């Protein structure tokens, strides 16, 4: 991994703006599967985080559609959150730095859902 390679990455946790339990302590209804469960996960070690960001689910879903159309990358809502945050961070830190994010799953199971329909 990155740490074993001598890289000291900043780790940013993400959550849907509609359920910002980590950033505000308040949960809410949202449509991003597999994230923002409305409670702080017991395995989350906040001491290892450099920040937490709440991303609007609609921005994430729009990003999913854009990634599929422009890049041929299928992902679910959490992937959309990741890419939205990565773009925000890249703009903030400027040129000459690297931002790494993940595509959490493929979008096939979301084809008939609110994301791609």
Language-model segments: residues:
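Buried hydrophobic packing segments
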Residues: 2, 64, 82-90
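Detector for Asparagine
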Residues: 50, 62, 82, 103-106
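Active-site/ligand-binding loops adjacent to catalytic centers
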Residues: 3-77, 114-117
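A short, small-residue-rich loop immediately preceding and capping a beta-strand
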Residues: 73-81, 100-102
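Phosphate-binding loop/pocket of nucleotide- and phosphate-handling active sites
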Residues: 37-38, 84-117
């Amino acid at each position: 991994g990155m740490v074993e390679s001598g890289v000291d990455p900043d780790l940013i946790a993400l959550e849907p703006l509609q359920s910002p339990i980590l950033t505000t302590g308040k949960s809410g209804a949202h449509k991003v599967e597999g994230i923002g469960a409305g409670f702080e996960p017991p395995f989350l070690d906040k001491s290892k985080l450099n920040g937490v960001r709440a991303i609007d689910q609609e921005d994430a879903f729009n990003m999913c559609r854009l990634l599929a159309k422009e890049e041929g990358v299928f992902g679910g809502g959490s992937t959309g959150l990741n890419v939205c945050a990565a773009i925000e961070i890249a703009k903030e830190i400027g040129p000459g730095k690297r931002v790494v994010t993940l595509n959490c799953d493929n979008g096939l199971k979301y084809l008939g859902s609110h994301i791609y329909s």
